[in-house]
Amino acid sequence: MGVSQSDHQTLVAPQPKGILDPATGKPVGNDSTFFGEINDELADKGFLVTSTQALITWARTGSLMWMQFGLACCAVEGLMQASGPRYDMERFGVAPRASPRQSDVMIVAGTLTNKMAPALRKVYDQMPEPRYVISMGSCANGGGYYHYSYSVVRGCDRVVPVDIYVPGCPPTAEALLYGVLLLQKKIRRTGTIER
């Protein structure tokens, strides 16, 4: 096994055997003789043997549709930069949508006030299950610079459940992309059927 070298110093990878489970890195059904035989027979014919949970989770992480709930400067500075051609969030399978009824992820960016909190909850309730929330910037995370103001909600997690917090004032585009990748990792880890 391993990498072999020929006389011309060309590295040749060994022929893959079976289908690898992305969660464990081991061949699917390697502890079961039945699945081992099926994988051996079908691997070279282009067939995939997997579970329904793994298939749904794979589809979920590769096609997240996000909408922004932009309240202040983070929505303009961070989201526009991350969506631009330099960082291009769509290469990770994350595409923007305008309607909450078509969205899986809501990115809350900016200072949430008491008057805007019911609107945030209403938009969140319109999203289909499973739904995820990314809190972007220190104002959305905990009130930020306006934390002690009478009209500011001290974090959007007091209104909607938040899955990923992206810190910064404003957060960089790299930080937002890292938050999206962490959300995809969380979806792979927890799955969608349990949620």
From Swiss-Prot:
Instruction: Choose any GO biological process term that the UniProt entry carries and state it.
Output: aerobic respiration
The annotation note on the cofactor reads: Binds 1 [4Fe-4S] cluster.
GO terms, molecular function: 4 iron, 4 sulfur cluster binding; iron ion binding; NADH dehydrogenase (ubiquinone) activity; NADH:ubiquinone reductase (non-electrogenic) activity; quinone binding
Q: Does the keyword Metal-binding apply?
A: yes
Taken from the record, one Pfam family name reads: Oxidored_q6
Supply the InterPro entries for this chain: NADH_UbQ_OxRdtase-like_20kDa (IPR006137), NADH_UQ_OxRdtase_20Kd_su (IPR006138)
Catalytic activity, per the record?
a quinone + NADH + 5 H(+)(in) = a quinol + NAD(+) + 4 H(+)(out)
Indicate how the chain sits in the lipid bilayer: Peripheral membrane protein
The subcellular location is:
Cell inner membrane
What are its cofactors? Answer: [4Fe-4S] cluster
What GO cellular component entries does it have? plasma membrane; respiratory chain complex I
Give the residue ranges for region: Disordered: 1-25
Binding-site positions, [4Fe-4S] cluster? 73-74, 139, 169
TM ranges are none
Keyword vocabulary terms for this entry = 4Fe-4S, Cell inner membrane, Cell membrane, Iron, Iron-sulfur, Membrane, Metal-binding, NAD, Quinone, Translocase, Transport, Ubiquinone
Which SUPFAM superfamilies does the entry link to? HydA/Nqo6-like
Q: What is its EC number?
A: 7.1.1.-
Name the domain of life this protein comes from: Bacteria
Q: Give yes or no: UniProt keyword Signal.
A: no
Question: In UniProt terms, what function does this protein have?
Answer: NDH-1 shuttles electrons from NADH, via FMN and iron-sulfur (Fe-S) centers, to quinones in the respiratory chain. The immediate electron acceptor for the enzyme in this species is believed to be ubiquinone. Couples the redox reaction to proton translocation (for every two electrons transferred, four hydrogen ions are translocated across the cytoplasmic membrane), and thus conserves the redox energy in a proton gradient.
What is said about its interaction partners and assembly?
NDH-1 is composed of 14 different subunits. Subunits NuoB, C, D, E, F, and G constitute the peripheral sector of the complex.
What does the sequence similarity comment in the record state about its family? Answer: Belongs to the complex I 20 kDa subunit family.
What is this protein's record name? NADH-quinone oxidoreductase subunit B
Q: Which organism is it from?
A: Allorhizobium ampelinum (strain ATCC BAA-846 / DSM 112012 / S4)
Upper lineage is: Bacteria, Pseudomonadati, Pseudomonadota, Alphaproteobacteria, Hyphomicrobiales
